[in-house]
Regions:
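Short, small-residue-biased leader/transition segments that mark boundaries at the very start
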Residues: 2-19
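Active-site-facing alpha/beta catalytic cores
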Residues: 64, 68-319, 362, 370, ...
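Ligand/cofactor-recognition surfaces for anionic moieties
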Residues: 51, 286, 455
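Structural motif
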Residues: 1, 10, 274-275, 380
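Non-transmembrane, aqueous-exposed alpha-helical and coiled segments at domain scale
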Residues: 296-305, 311-343, 349-398
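General beta-strand structural signal in soluble alpha/beta enzymes
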Residues: 57-59, 97-99, 343-345, 390
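Amphipathic coiled-coil/heptad-repeat helices and related helical stalk/stem segments
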Residues: 2, 268-269, 323, 327
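N-terminal "leader" segments that precede or initiate the main folded domain
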Residues: 20-75
Length: 455
């Protein structure tokens, strides 16, 4: 558990009521949401990501909400992630590790403890795990019962995701059925349909050779993992369990397979770092433009003292204008140190702007520019661009502007449903997947040329 004396900037801002002891006790006796062996398996998969043997796709809601928690939304997000993974697999010729920002992403750090509208000041909305989005006194009061609601909704989401992953929805013979209705007819849907036809032809050949979904599990099932920011530590600690089954005994967070530390809570004296240091799950660390290379090395050594591949993934969120200038010194320092990490690109959080209409939005051009910059730096440094981390949804929202099926600022109000930051819709998500696939294919070609040149 996190030491009491360690500074915890995000949790000390008037949220004491959230952590009432009876709620913690109730959570501590509830069954784990995930199991140690699942987290251990993901750690092995993340080792492959760090070594360039697999590629990470991490995506889902900025902040899940109780209002949007239903089977259709979960299914549609899962389906878009499956489509993106197929596109990335085709481009990279690598296994794609699929991790959702799902089943627990109900809290958000805020830069200000208060929100002011028309001279009225109320506590900031911190996600449905803490309080309600409605701008009213009672709604903004922290409510400890919400922790139990998050547990229940996360459990039902995980149950559904496991059913989807192993119950036939991931069957590769159903590739053509994954397209969402509102995506049909777009350029991305046409490109996806062409790719699906190529894969179907390959499957027909494999079927003729005796490999079918009935006798080959990999053709009908997929591994799917969950993750969220480990922000509210009393929730995380109450769901931390000791693994007593295997020889590799240790403490595991059982609220998700993977947790990450946000850019606002990554100071080395934060309670969040102390908590993450003590769990055996694979973990992520967000790195923003203010990240100092020496501080980063100290954090890596604290979070991964045994220097194990798969333990720690650095999630870079620099902004399109700064990605090359800010990311290169970090990669240089880590490479020189010999420390083993995975590298992942979050092109969302550094590119949030306010539209003239007042809506927060993100521009597809900026998002794509940061992804390109991420790959450019890694190609130059001969390091591994290990993954991408998107905020997206399977819903037909209008929250990010741009893309081939263009959403402009005038459209933002049409279907702006996010409870926090703007998300990519399914069409925009597929467009980005095709971009990343092209970059991965180019990276593969460059690597092959280097190997030939050396030999």
């Amino acid at each position: 558990q996190a030491e009491d004396g360690i500074r915890d900037a995000q949790e000390s801002r008037g949220l004491g009521d959230v952590y009432k002891r009876q709620i913690e006790k109730e959570l501590s006796i509830r069954p784990p949401l995930v199991f140690a062996e699942e987290a251990r398996r993901l750690r092995k998969r993340m080792a492959d990501v760090a070594e360039g043997k697999a590629f990470l796709l991490q995506g889902g809601d900025c902040a899940e909400s109780f209002a949007e928690h239903n089977a259709n939304n979960i299914r549609d997000s899962f389906r878009v992630l499956l489509q993106m993974a197929v596109v990335l697999t085709f481009g990279s010729a690598l296994p794609v590790i699929k991790i959702g920002r799902l089943a627990g992403q109900y809290s958000k750090p805020r830069s200000s403890p208060f929100e002011v509208i028309n001279d009225v000041s109320l506590p900031s909305y911190r996600g449905d795990m803490v309080n309600d989005m409605a701008f009213e006194d009672k709604a903004r009061e922290p409510n400890p019962e919400r922790l139990l609601q998050v547990y229940d909704k996360s459990a039902s989401t995980l149950n559904l995701l496991r059913a989807f992953a192993g119950g036939g929805m991931a069957d590769l013979t159903k590739l053509h059925e994954w397209n969402l209705e509102f995506v049909s007819g777009t350029n991305e849907a046409i490109k996806y349909k062409e790719l699906a036809s190529q894969i179907t032809s390959s499957l027909e050949f494999m079927n003729a050779c005796g490999m079918t979904p009935e006798n080959t599990a990999q053709l009908r099932e997929t591994e799917f993992y969950t993750s969220h920011e480990g922000l509210l530590l009393n929730y995380e600690e109450a769901l931390t369990r000791k693994d007593t089954i295997t020889e590799e005994k240790g403490w595991f967070a059982t609220s998700a397979h993977m947790l990450w530390v946000g850019d606002r809570t990554r100071s080395i004296d934060e309670a969040h770092i102390e908590y993450m240091r003590g769990i055996a799950n694979p973990i992520g660390l967000k790195c923003g433009p203010s990240t100092d290379p020496d501080d980063l090395l100290r954090l890596i050594e604290k979070l991964n003292p045994l220097n194990q591949a798969g333990r720690l993934t650095l999630i870079a969120r620099m902004g399109s204008a700064d990605v090359y200038k800010k990311l290169k010194p970090l990669i240089t320092a880590v490479k020189k140190s010999g420390l083993i990490v995975g590298w992942c690109c979050d092109p969302m959080h550094g590119n949030t702007v306010k539209a003239s209409s007042g809506f927060k939005t993100r521009k597809m051009d900026d998002i794509m520019a940061e992804v390109r910059g991420f790959f450019e730096v890694h190609n130059e440094m001969h390091t591994v661009p290990g993954g991408v981390h998107f905020e997206m949804t399977g819903q037909n929202v209008t929250e990010c502007v741009g893309g081939v099926y263009e959403v402009n600022e005038a459209n933002l109000a049409d279907r702006y449903h996010t409870h926090c930051d703007p998300r990519l819709n399914a069409t925009q998500s597929l467009e980005l997947a095709f971009l990343v696939a092209d970059l991965l294919a180019e990276n593969r070609t460059n690597l092959a040329k280097k190997i030939v040149a050396v030999s």
